[in-house]
Swiss-Prot record:
Region (Disordered): 1-58, 131-224, 261-329, 354-374, 537-570
Function comment: Transcription factor which regulates nonfermentable carbon utilization. Activator of gluconeogenetic genes.
Residue ranges, compositional bias (Low complexity): 354-366, 540-555
Feature: compositional bias, Polar residues: 38-51, 131-218, 264-287, 314-325
The keyword Cytoplasm is annotated on this UniProt entry: no
Gene name for this UniProt entry: acuK
Protein's name in the database: Transcription activator of gluconeogenesis acuK
Localization per record: Nucleus
InterPro entries, per the entry: ERT1_acuK_gluconeogen_tf (IPR050335), PAS_13 (IPR056751), Zn2-C6_fun-type_DNA-bd_sf (IPR036864), Zn2Cys6_DnaBD (IPR001138)
Amino acid sequence: MKTEDNGSAPALAGDHGGVDQDTPDAGDRTEQAKHKTNGTTEKAPKSSNAKDPSRPRRKKARRACFACQRAHLTCGDERPCQRCIKRGLQDACHDGVRKKAKYLHDAPDGALMPGVGGNFYNNAMRNNLPLSRNGATTVNTTSQQNSGSSYYPTPQSNSYNVYQDTPLTQNSFPSQSPVSPTFNMKTTPTARSNSLSSSVNQQPPNTTVSGATQSQNPFAGPFFDPSDPALFNFDLSSMNFENRYGALEFGMLGHMATGAGDSPTDSATQRGSMGRSGSTQYSTTPITGAPGFGESPGNQQPFMFGNDPLLNEWPNSQAPNQGHLNVSGVYPQGGMMHMAKSDAPHAFAIESGPASFSSPSATTSPHINSGYDESSLSNTVVNKSNGLTANGQRPAITTPSLKHQSLQFGVKRRQRNPSTVYESVKEPYAYTNRFHNLTAFIQRRFSPQKTLQIAKALASIRPSFIATTKTLNRDDLIFMEKCFQRTLWEYEDFINACGTPTIVCRRTGEIAAVGKEFSILTGWKKDVLLGKEPNLNVNTGGSSAPGSGTTSRGSFTPRSSTLENATPGRPQPVFLAELLDDDSVVEFYEDFARLAFGDSRGSVMTTCKLLKYKTKEDMELAQSDDNQRWNNHLRKGGIAGEAGMNQLGFKDGKVECAYCWTVKRDVFDIPMLIVMNVSCQCF
C-alpha cells in the first residue's frame, strides 16, 4: 500500500487542471493502472468497487463548502476541505450559501448554522475574557478557532458589544433589574446618588468581538441586528432548537418581557426609545433626592431595549444656562390626583420600573396613598424649586422617580380597596325582614287581583329558597353578604363607565346601586333610591284596576311606622316595585320566578313604564295647562340634553322604556342580585 500511495501523488498533483477527476469511476481506473504498472497480478481491492454494498460510505458533511457546492461533489466537515486542498483552493474554502425556506428569508445566514460548534456568544467565553485598562474586554475571533467548525458572520454584524457581569458590583448601577439575583429592595435615594456620582467618569464596560481589535459606538450600527446572539444574554447553543433562528426568536420574546421594568420613566421623550447624546440632562429633585432623567428630543439616538441600568439613567454633565422644568413643580401633587385614580386597576407601566413584582393593591402600592384625605389643594405640599429659567431658553422637562414619591389626594375620594368589603361585613343581611317589607308594600299599593298574581309568582320559588338556605349557618350567611358586596363593588365601576341607565337591586327588589343616567331619566336621586334620604314620592301611576273597592288608595305611598320604629336609623332602600307601574311589576315578578332558579344565563327583554319621582308640588304643577304645551313639544321635536330627559313623563308621571335584566347567583346558587339596563322609547 505504500507503493500505491507513492504512485498516487502524481495523480493528485495533476488534478489542478480544469477537468475534475474526483468521481469514483476515475479513481477505479487510476488504481487499476497503478496495479498494472507495478507488475502485480492481484485484482483491485473489494472496497474500491463503487457499486459494492460493503464498501464504506463517506460521511456526509453538515454543510458543503462553496466550491464543492457548485461542483455538486461530496465535501467534508473540515475547513479547508480535502478537495480544496488538492485543488489549491484552501485559502478560499468557506461554507456555501444554503437555500432557505420562505419563512426563513429574513433570517441571517449565521443564525441557520446547524450544530453547536459555531463561535456564537456563550457564557463560558464571556467569563474568560480578560479586562483591559478602561474596563473594556477585547476579544479577537481569529485567535479562537474552533476545531469543529467556524462561524463566518455577515458584514453588518461584524462587531458587537457584550456587557459583562462578573466584575461589576451593585454600586455601579443606579438602578437594578428586579429580575436579577442582586436586586435590592432597600435601595435608598442617597445610595443611588452616590453610585451615580461615582460612575460619571466611567465608561460602560463592553466586549468588542470582531475580526480585528477596534472600538465602535455600540449604537452607531443598525437599529436592531437579529444576528447578534449577545443581545439576548443567554447561550443559544444550550437551547433545544432545530435552528438558531428559532432560539433567537424565543430569546427576543423573553428579552422584551423581562426588560419592560427598567425602561426610562421620562414621558417627555420619544415613546419606546431613548437617547445617549450629549444633550442628555440629569437632575435631582430637592424633596426626595431621586434622580430624574431628561433629554432633548432633537438629538436622540434610539436603541431598542432599555433594560441595562447603566443606560437608563446615564449621567452627563449639565450644560450651562440650561434650565430644568420639574413636572412635580409645575403640577401640584394634589392637583394631579384626578389623573392618579386610586380606584383604577394598579399595573406596572412599560416605561416605569416597579418597586417589586408582587401583586399590586391600593394599600401596598408605593405610588398612591389611598384612603380619605380631607386636606384641600392649598394645604398640599407643592414643590416649586424647579421652574423656568430667566434667560428664556427652552427648558428640558424631567420627571422624578416615582419609586420614592408619596402622592396625596387633594380631594375626598371613595376608598376603592376590595379588602374593605371583607372587613366591613360583620352581620348577615336580614332578607327575611326585607321580604316582609316587600309583602306589606305590595298589599298596600296593588289591587287584590294583582297582589294575588305577584304572590303566586313568589310562592313558586319559595320552596327553592327554603331548600337552598336550610343548611346555611351564620358564617355562610355572612359569607353570602360578602359575596354580594364584592360583586357590587365590581358592578359600580361598570355602571360609572357605561352610559346606559342601569340599576342593581337585591333579590328582594331593594335598590343597591344606580347610575347617573337612570337618575336623569326618572328623576329619582341616588341617595333616595339607596335610602340615604327620605322618599317623598307620591307618584304610583294611578290605579290600573278600576273599581278595586278602596278609595284610600291614593297616590301617596306611606312608610310603615312599625317597621321604621323597629330599625331606627337604618337605611330603607326603595323597592324596584316602586319604580314601575302596576302591569310592569306583575310582569317583572312572573319573569323573575322563571329565571330565579331556572336558566342561570337567561335574560328578559321587554317594555315597561317607569314612574317619575314626583312630590306633591310636582303633581300640582303637572295639572296646569302650561305643561301641555311642553308635552306637545316633546312629541314633535324630541328631547335635547339632560333638561329634555328630565321633562320626559312630566305630565302623566310615566316614561315608556325598554329594559333588559338578568339574575346573578352567588356561590350557593341562590339569586343574589338583579342587573337591569333601561333604554328610553320616547321617539
